[in-house]
């Protein structure tokens, strides 16, 4: 599995190419269920986006398909990429972490990019002390 950042993750900025952010927003704008996937790259810089099927097929929560997750993680490892973050959408809600997101952030202590169908997006990180902090997003 590719390495992911440790729980003492100190990056305060997520750097994402504009075409990747646009691709995520485009899929989210036409989806009736939460969209999810991985942000792969190096440190805090996104070099690849990988959509993963939401196996819950739900408009209010997501769970990445385990087989697709494994395949994506193996591909990233072959490409020497790390898990920079996880992205998912909220439908008809602001892009802020929910209680369920907080639980996921404890399991995956990386940046979480949350977007909605209005084109709003924010990124978040969970500290070791379970404090959620907003992460600045730089679109290149």
UniProtKB/Swiss-Prot annotation:
The record marks 98 as: Transition state stabilizer. Its cofactor is Zn(2+). It catalyses: an N(6)-[small archaeal modifier protein]-[protein]-L-lysine + H2O = a [protein]-L-lysine + a [small archaeal modifier protein]. Transmembrane segments: none annotated. InterPro entries: JAB_dom_prok (IPR028090), JAMM/MPN+_dom (IPR000555), MPN (IPR037518), VirAsm_ModProt (IPR051929). Binds 1 zinc ion per subunit. Zn(2+) binds at residues 88, 90, 101. Pfam families: Prok-JAB (PF14464). Belongs to the peptidase M67B family. This is Desampylase.
